[in-house]
């Protein structure tokens, strides 16, 4: 079996994912990138057939990937794609067992999410509203910080998802789970301002937030605009949508201490995902202690 034949098997798998599983083009592209990298590694190891692949060869793929500078998280993604591919080959009767089943990547160090402090959030939101797109951006910033939305949830908002009388939005989160969220008085105010101007761009588009071309704004466009506003407003740290979500979670937890409530607002399936913010909260408390407690003031 040549590299071409190896690639043909991968192409068949990708067609299966696209047609039968109906995965998104972005997900398919990610699978293709990972499996193309595996095919290149297979060429380095002299692998001629997927049937020749065993756990030792899969481990060699992992080692070679690490030597090429692939981080633990990216390696885990690559091995996950390979396991899915081998599972499919097993289902097709082309492999007896999945050789990647017992091979795992080293655990990635868990970095605490960085957040923006309250003063910087206020400075970020105090933007120059000299054009309709700036009003749109202010509304997006207010909604993102006011409800802790994921970027995909923000760009996926339609006008029909709003209830401005109650100050709530309906969002579709991960796993097609819908949740109803309060967004706060300021977010409602700026959505109303944006809706007054939105007709300048489109009238028959369902999306709440539009690009200057009158279409649903893209995630990339939101990232770009938020970063630009961070620079314009003089923030020291890079502003991206997920950092606003982190800031929402951290500030909510610091104020309320209600971990379960924050979990529901963020749409986390597992409490353990939300618990990372307790570490951020502890860091805040520890810094207060070190600055204020007499026993913490060493050498004074």
UniProtKB/Swiss-Prot annotation:
Q: Catalytic residues per the record?
A: 150, 174, 242, 245, 268, 277 (o-(3'-phospho-dna)-tyrosine intermediate)
For this UniProt record, give its keywords in alphabetical order, as a comma-separated list.
Answer: Cell cycle, Cell division, Chromosome partition, Cytoplasm, DNA integration, DNA recombination, DNA-binding
Q: Where is the Tyr recombinase domain?
A: 111-290
Q: Which InterPro entries match?
A: CB, DNA_brk_join_enz, Integrase-like_cat_sf, Integrase_catalytic, Integrase_recombinase_N, Integrase_SAM-like_N, Recomb_XerC, Tyrosine_recombinase_XerC/XerD
- Where mainly located? cytoplasm
Location in the cell reads: Cytoplasm
UniProt key word Cytoplasm: yes
Which Gene Ontology MF annotations are present?
DNA binding; tyrosine-based site-specific recombinase activity
Domain of life, per UniProt, equals Bacteria
Q: Summarize what activates or inhibits it.
A: FtsK may regulate the catalytic switch between XerC and XerD in the heterotetrameric complex during the two steps of the recombination process.
Sequence ranges assigned to domain Core-binding (CB) in this UniProt record: 4-90
Its GO CC terms? cytoplasm; Holliday junction resolvase complex
The keyword Cytoplasm is assigned to this record: yes
- What family is reported? Belongs to the 'phage' integrase family. XerC subfamily.
Q: What does this protein do?
A: Site-specific tyrosine recombinase, which acts by catalyzing the cutting and rejoining of the recombining DNA molecules. Binds cooperatively to specific DNA consensus sequences that are separated from XerD binding sites by a short central region, forming the heterotetrameric XerC-XerD complex that recombines DNA substrates. The complex is essential to convert dimers of the bacterial chromosome into monomers to permit their segregation at cell division. It also contributes to the segregational stability of plasmids. In the complex XerC specifically exchanges the top DNA strands.
Oligomer status and interactors? Forms a cyclic heterotetrameric complex composed of two molecules of XerC and two molecules of XerD, in which XerC interacts with XerD via its C-terminal region, XerD interacts with XerC via its C-terminal region and so on.
Indicate what this protein is called per its UniProt record: Tyrosine recombinase XerC
What organism does the UniProt record list as the source?
Answer: Salmonella typhimurium (strain LT2 / SGSC1412 / ATCC 700720)
